[in-house]
Amino acid sequence: MPTKKNNFEEQLNELEKIVTNLENGNVPLEDALKEFQEGVKISRDLDKKLTNAEQTVAKLIDSDGTEHNLDPNNASAPEE
């Protein structure tokens, strides 16, 4: 089970293991439900981490310290 201390890659690997187990279909129904629930939790946590990383990367800081957010629909042009 992943903990909050696990990094993105560790959680992604755990999610991939869960998906593989469920795809194989050799998991009893009760265990499959538990694994599915854990997979959903991990997926949501990974989504939050990706969103936070995206927001961090989307900020540009000019040489004078002024921050500009990138338009997510047009990553090449900062918003004014």
From Swiss-Prot:
Gene3D superfamilies membership: Exonuclease VII, small subunit
Biased composition annotated in UniProt, kind: Basic and acidic residues: 61-70
Catalytic activity field: Exonucleolytic cleavage in either 5'- to 3'- or 3'- to 5'-direction to yield nucleoside 5'-phosphates
Domain of life: Bacteria
Free-text function comment from the UniProt entry: Bidirectionally degrades single-stranded DNA into large acid-insoluble oligonucleotides, which are then degraded further into small acid-soluble oligonucleotides.
Compositionally biased residues, Polar residues: 71-80
Record keyword Iron-sulfur present: no
GO biological process, one term: DNA catabolic process
Annotated region (Disordered), positions in chain: 60-80
EC numbers on record: 3.1.11.6
Binding partners and assembly: Heterooligomer composed of large and small subunits.
Species, as recorded: Lactobacillus acidophilus (strain ATCC 700396 / NCK56 / N2 / NCFM)
InterPro entries, per database record: Exonuc_VII_S (IPR003761), Exonuc_VII_ssu_sf (IPR037004)
Record family assignment: Belongs to the XseB family.
Assigned keywords, A-Z: Cytoplasm, Exonuclease, Hydrolase, Nuclease
Annotated GO CC locations: cytosol; exodeoxyribonuclease VII complex
Name of the top EC class for this enzyme: hydrolase
Pfam families: Exonuc_VII_S (PF02609)
Compartments (UniProt record): Cytoplasm
GO MF annotation terms: exodeoxyribonuclease VII activity
Keyword Transferase belongs to the record: no
Name of the molecule in the record: Exodeoxyribonuclease 7 small subunit
PANTHER family linked: EXODEOXYRIBONUCLEASE 7 SMALL SUBUNIT
Gene symbol of the encoding locus: xseB
